[in-house]
Design a protein with these regions (language model features):
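Generic N-terminal amphipathic, Lys/Arg-enriched alpha-helix
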Residues: 1-20
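N-terminal low-complexity or amphipathic/hydrophobic leaders
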Residues: 20-109, 122, 127, 131
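A glycine- and small-aliphatic-rich helix-loop capping segment at beta-alpha/alpha-beta transitions
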Residues: 85-86, 150-155
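Flexible, glycine/proline-enriched loop segments at strand-loop-helix junctions
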Residues: 111-119
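Histidine-centered catalytic micro-motifs
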Residues: 135-150
C-alpha cells in the first residue's frame, strides 16, 4: 500500500484550521480521515471510524483529556472538524467497569460526555475507541474482507 500522505497538504490544512481555533492534532486527524475515506479499497460508502485522544479546553476547567470520534452519519472522505465531536475521556472510561449497558443508556451517557452539547452524536463504537489505549485509531470497512465474509461458501 502506498502512502498518500502529503506534508504540504497537511500543513495547509493545519494553517486553515488554526485560523478557526482548531488544534493541529485535530486538523491532522481530519486530514488522515479524509485520506482513508477517499480510498475505496479501505472504506465502503464513507463508513468506518477514526478517533484521536488529545486535550482540549472546555472554557471552564481548562485543558481536559478528550477523545474525538467520528460522528454518526459523517462521511470519512468529506469530514470536517465538527464531525469529530469531543468527549471527556475520563467520563467514558468510568463505563469500562460495567458488566452491561443497554444501547439507549450508552447513547445518553455519550451525549452527556460531550464537550459541546450541540455536537453531533458520536459513533456507536465510541466506547471501543475510548477503552483502547492508543492515541489514534483507524477503523475502516474495507471492501476485500467483506467479499470473503459475505461469500456464500465462507466459513
Amino acid at each position: 500500500m502506498k502512502s498518500k500522505w502529503n506534508e504540504e497538504t497537511a500543513e495547509i490544512l493545519i494553517q486553515q484550521y488554526e485560523n478557526q481555533g482548531i488544534s493541529k492534532d485535530l486538523a491532522l486527524r481530519v486530514y488522515s480521515c479524509r485520506l482513508l475515506g477517499h480510498d475505496p479499497s479501505l472504506v465502503l460508502h464513507g463508513g468506518g471510524n477514526v478517533s484521536l485522544k488529545t486535550s482540549a479546553s472546555d472554557g471552564l476547567k481548562g485543558d481536559q483529556q478528550v477523545i474525538c470520534v467520528k460522528g454518526s452519519g459523517w462521511d470519512m472522505g468529506d469530514i470536517e472538524p465538527p464531525g469529530l465531536p469531543s468527549m471527556y475521556l475520563d467520563q467514558l472510561l468510568k463505563l469500562q467497569s460495567l458488566t452491561s449497558l443497554v444501547d439507549e443508556d450508552m447513547v445518553t451517557y455519550q451525549r452527556r460526555s460531550l464537550l459541546h452539547p450541540s455536537s453531533p452524536n458520536p459513533s456507536i463504537e465510541t466506547l471501543l475507541h475510548a477503552f483502547l489505549p492508543h492515541t489514534y485509531i483507524d477503523h475502516t470497512h474495507a471492501f476485500l474482507p467483506h467479499t470473503y465474509i459475505d461469500h456464500t461458501h465462507a466459513t
